[in-house]
């Protein structure tokens, strides 16, 4: 019985392959213009790897952590499922997020957070949830 259990474990371990993980299919990019001290805005947009699509439901979520020196108007953002160009459950135009920030002091900041989304590979018939650690760079002048 033990030999059978060990055999099953070995077979399953080989199926996953060494270092097997999901591909990162959506890469965030950030507006690079400096923000004036006071109030400003950072735009977060996304590039999707060829061959993959991003689900409209559940929504794309961007959850940010508060940091010293910056006030974030919103720390939990979710995309709208509406996409007028879409005829199925996937985005044609992946939405962007506008992040309103306030800072009294100039300097370099990094806003840490998590990006959560669901993607599919239509060719493989495979869908999955992905969680990505992000650091949004921000220069306040």
Regions found by a protein language model. Give the residues of each.
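Extracellular/lumen-exposed scaffold segments
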Residues: 15-141
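Hydrophobic h-region of N-terminal signal peptides that target proteins for export
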Residues: 5-18
